[in-house]
Design a protein with these regions (language model features):
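Conserved N-terminal phosphate-binding loop of PLP-dependent enzymes in the Aspartate aminotransferase
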Residues: 8-434
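Single conserved hydrophobic/aromatic residue that forms the stacking wall/gate
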Residues: 1-7
Length: 434
């Protein structure tokens, strides 16, 4: 990489970027051949491992036939087949393609708003999100993101959301179960929708795990109550499963654990096995019909991108879904979930660990300055970064979220590799809190 300037931020002057040359399975390899176990699936995307042979073969074959075509006035087999497969998996009726997760959020927000305009409820212009939520970094997605740094920086140009308290079990008072706390928080949502549904288009949430917000986890009963409240008060429910879909929470989709169907289901990241960018917005026939009208009516949904429905990305997604099914991945993951829990359980006794929490193939360790009070380390001390640095010396790619160290590995990881990562994290925490 001689002559290539990669120092985009001051941190890279003393902590250089990893020059990755290739990847296979659960590993990344730098230009010198050094392996790094990808503990975070390269930002939660490479579900079944890097360079999966079935995906690679499917892409090579697709590239020989159709690489790209405008998706306005044209269609093609990969896009149709993928839409049919996604509808069959989710129980929803219609699919709108986007390229990245943030774009899918934009589509859902616009489509919900536009739906209400088309059916004559023009006062519905507001969105509700959960405290601590994260839905992406385009302007619309940031508008329903409750992260202080983003709102402080971009607040003047963002929409103003209505924020309702999240059911984050970590915040539950002593002696209150995760389920009871979720019901308590759902009660506040129910009151909000009852009072202000005439101005609210939709509630958007991340089912079961608020990932970028610190791997905050909550009980499925909140989703049940949220679905019921939205249905009662005529508000759309947008389920952002971009990070947690396709088995990450233990079921194919997180919403299944609550037995609910959202009005909009957002998918991305692992949809293509992490090979290419693709996102999808699934919705109901009711929503679709609100836009199905003549040109003269001017009721059509207004959203398009140059690479919408690209044949290569659709083929990669189909291959990913085929591999998940053929390899019985979700059933096999049960043993990996047990291995993750067992490997990191000892850390729950550490004096600087407030909690080890897990949902499916996500497990997180919350570092604190004091266990009894759960007082946090000063964010400026960057304790999580110290764990990351140690991981690199031991051939592990971690990416803590502040003081939360987590594993979100590819499904091809082994029990031995999980144990290795647990050892690396344990060592890293000892260094970080010293």
């Amino acid at each position: 990489m001689t002559g290539v300037q990669t120092c985009a931020l001051p941190i890279y002057e003393w902590l250089p970027m990893l020059p990755i040359a290739r990847a296979h399975g659960a590993y990344l390899y730098d230009v010198d051949g050094r392996p790094y176990l990808d503990a975070i699936s390269s930002w939660w995307t490479c579900l079944i491992g890097h360079s999966h042979p079935h995906i690679v073969a499917a892409l090579k074959n697709q590239l020989d036939t159709l690489d790209h075509v405008i998706f306005g006035g044209c269609t093609h087999e990969p896009a149709v087949a993928l839409a049919e497969k996604l509808c069959a998996l989710t129980g929803l009726d219609r699919v709108f393609y986007a390229d990245i997760g943030s774009a899918a959020v934009e589509v859902a927000l616009k489509m919900s708003f536009h739906y209400w305009q088309n059916v004559g409820q023009a006062k519905k212009v507001r969105f509700v999100c959960l405290s601590g939520s994260y839905h992406g970094e385009t302007l619309g997605a940031l508008s329903v993101t409750d992260v202080a740094l983003y709102r402080k920086t971009y607040g003047p140009i963002l929409l103003e959301p209505i924020i309702t308290p999240a059911p984050d079990a970590y915040q539950a008072p002593a002696g209150v179960s995760a389920r009871d706390f979720a019901i308590m928080q759902a009660g506040q949502l129910e009151q909000l929708l009852a009072a202000r549904s005439d101005e609210i288009c939709a509630l958007i949430l991340e089912p079961l795990v608020q990932c970028a917000g610190g791997m905050r986890m909550y009980h499925p009963v909140y989703l049940e109550r949220a679905r019921a409240a939205c249905s009662t008060h005529g508000v759309h429910l947008i389920a952002d499963e971009i990070a947690v879909g396709f088995g990450r929470t233990g079921t194919m989709f997180a919403c299944q654990q609550a037995g609910i169907r959202a009005d909009f289901l957002l998918l991305g990241k692992g949809l293509t096995g992490g090979v290419l960018p693709l996102a999808a917005v699934l919705t109901t026939e009711v929503v679709y019909q609100a836009f199905y009208a003549s040109y003269a009516s001017q009721r059509a949904f207004l959203h398009s991108h140059s690479f919408t429905g690209n044949p290569l990305v659709c083929r990669a997604a189909l291959a990913t879904l085929e591999a998940l099914e053929a390899e019985d991945t979700l059933n096999k993951n049960r043993a990996l979930q047990v291995a993750m829990a067992a490997a990191l359980a000892p850390l729950s006794e550490h004096p600087n660990v407030a909690e080890v929490r897990q949902t499916g193939m996500i497990i997180a360790v919350e570092l604190v300055a004091d266990k009894a009070s759960r007082s946090a380390f000063d964010w400026r001390e960057r304790r999580g970064l110290r764990v990351y640095q140690h991981g690199l010396t031991r051939g592990a790619l971690l990416r803590p979220l502040g003081n939360v160290v987590y594993l979100m590995p590819p499904y091809c990881i082994t029990a031995d590799e999980i144990q290795h990562l647990a050892s690396v994290i344990t060592e890293g925490i000892a260094i970080a809190v010293a």
